[in-house]
């Protein structure tokens, strides 16, 4: 699949003349393996060296070109002159009582993002950010209060995975990636696609199965079909309401792409065999948790290969919404279940360290002295 060599990061990160070895060094992780092979070919170096270099970067997690002992010294010298191996700095770490870990990453320009490592029964899931801040303005999300600062580069997206992997004990396994952290992934489309290429590269990349990678969108409709053609990762859609008036209030993007437009994009989304779209539904007391809402949701999802992830609202300081009581949550779930939908109720983890759904804000002051 063809990818653009250039990515759409902030001006200071734009790659200029990367095919020219005299350009300023750039982070090599901003390239797909295929584009790096093109660069090697342009410098009269056998393209198969791209496989070797990427294995060093993402399988062996080398931090310098000198560690790449099966690459000749002249090639290593050229690589060191042309590229840098970027690594994100973990500025702070917090651990929840339930074992959830939240990482505050410091970027090269001084900005901060957060990632969350979520413990499951026998593995971990990493929630990854794709932007510094977010422009979507969802009423229930703390990231929205930060506003949009910039897109993350491919290196900064994959760097969160590498950073988390480095903290794992030998017996701990990271098997799942969810692009559900700070930012709207489809608003940073090119960089996200480039990073997914590396994350899901089973030979020389981070080696995650596409079945274990999920991208969540607020409903940026024009980018949905291209996503389905570019990758087979799982799609999750943050729906959160069953009528346009409520969704307009919760998610301003609905004024541009209302529910009927969003769901039509879901109906025509190029799903792989036996896959379903996950519809995320944050339950807020008195807002979208009634029996009528549940019945409308059933009607809306007809003819879509769908499953539903119910997320009881995670209350936080200054929040305008409340979590429904357990009876309301169970009633909503049962209505969907009785209509043969696969329904999960997300068990919120990390709420005591503001690491649960909707709570990421990269507020360094909340970390205190906890390293």
Curated annotation (Swiss-Prot):
Protein keywords: 4Fe-4S, Cytoplasm, Disulfide bond, Iron, Iron-sulfur, Metal-binding, Methyltransferase, rRNA processing, S-adenosyl-L-methionine, Transferase, tRNA processing
Other known facts: Reaction proceeds by a ping-pong mechanism involving intermediate methylation of a conserved cysteine residue.
GO biological process terms held by the UniProt record: rRNA base methylation; tRNA methylation
Record-level Gene Ontology MF annotations: 4 iron, 4 sulfur cluster binding; metal ion binding; rRNA (adenine(2503)-C2-)-methyltransferase activity; rRNA binding; tRNA (adenine(37)-C2)-methyltransferase activity; tRNA binding
Binding site for S-adenosyl-L-methionine: 183-184, 216, 238-240, 314
Binding positions for [4Fe-4S] cluster per the UniProt entry: 134, 138, 141
UniProt lineage: Bacteria, Pseudomonadati, Thermodesulfobacteriota, Desulfobacteria, Desulfobacterales
Family matches, as PANTHER family: 23S RRNA METHYLTRANSFERASE, RADICAL SAM CORE DOMAIN-CONTAINING PROTEIN
Entry protein name: Dual-specificity RNA methyltransferase RlmN
Native source species: Desulfosudis oleivorans (strain DSM 6200 / JCM 39069 / Hxd3) (Desulfococcus oleovorans)
Enzyme class: transferase
Ranges for domain Radical SAM core: 120-352
A cellular component annotation (GO) from this entry: cytoplasm
HAMAP family: RNA_methyltr_RlmN (MF_01849)
Superkingdom classification of source: Bacteria
Keyword Repeat tagged: no
